[in-house]
């Protein structure tokens, strides 16, 4: 069950492991990647929990302005890199705009290449986060899961977990700001599926995309093997 992958942290709502998902050669491995919303604070217990999941590195996908306004507490505890994704800080106004906004992030190939090399070169586990852990994090994690041979249904199901964990926060945000469209903010499975379809039409697939970014085939294959386990 996807809910069994949740990582319990005191100040983070939307943290979960990318391990345990059905993949082409078995299941995705734990201790490789976790995803979350921004950890604004981390207790000693939280740090121990993340380390128990193998986390030694953190990739922050937010804009420089977001990082300056709300620094990630993970920076002081782990090997940290901030890579703002193209258009990632722009909020879609309607649900129909969501898949196109996700595809636009993949067009920022300089930023995406830097992020993917960081993930590929990390010797241990990496926590990937943005602000809510939905859009930018969702795009990067979808590419990783495609590479591992995870089915579209499982990728969309993982993405939709954010709706469960973050809905109270989104309801509050929309109540405070009438310009926000709740329907465009929630993590709908159909939005992720539309992105996956558009991504393949544009790039061919995850391996083709990573090679376009400059990762060589041997590096991609080792990365794929690291992400999956037999059985």
Residue ranges and their predicted role:
Residues 1-127, 140-231:
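Cys-dependent protein tyrosine phosphatase-like superfamily
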Residues 132, 136-137:
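Ser/Thr-glycine-rich phosphate-binding loops at phosphate-binding pockets of nucleotides
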């Amino acid at each position: 069950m996807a809910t069994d992958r949740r990582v319990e942290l005191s100040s983070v709502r939307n943290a979960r492991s990318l391990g345990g998902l059905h993949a082409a050669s078995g299941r995705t491995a734990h201790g490789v990647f976790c995803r979350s919303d921004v950890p604004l604070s981390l207790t000693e217990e939280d740090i121990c929990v993340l380390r128990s999941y193998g986390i030694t590195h953190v990739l922050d996908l937010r804009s420089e302005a977001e990082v300056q306004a709300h620094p990630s507490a993970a920076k002081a505890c782990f090997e940290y890199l901030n890579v703002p994704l193209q258009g990632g800080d722009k909020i879609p106004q309607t649900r129909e705009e969501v898949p196109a906004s996700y595809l636009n992030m993949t067009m920022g190939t300089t930023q995406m290449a830097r992020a993917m090399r960081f993930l590929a070169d990390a010797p241990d586990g990496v926590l990937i986060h943005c602000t809510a852990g939905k859009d930018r994090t969702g795009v990067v994690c979808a590419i990783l899961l495609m590479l591992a041979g995870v089915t579209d249904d499982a990728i969309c199901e993982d993405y939709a977990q954010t709706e469960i964990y973050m809905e109270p926060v989104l309801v509050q945000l929309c109540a405070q700001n009438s310009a926000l469209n709740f329907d465009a903010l929630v993590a709908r499975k159909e939005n992720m599926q539309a992105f996956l379809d558009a991504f393949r039409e544009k790039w061919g697939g995850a391996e083709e995309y990573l090679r376009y970014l400059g990762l060589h085939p041997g590096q991609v294959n080792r990365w794929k093997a690291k992400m999956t386990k037999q059985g």
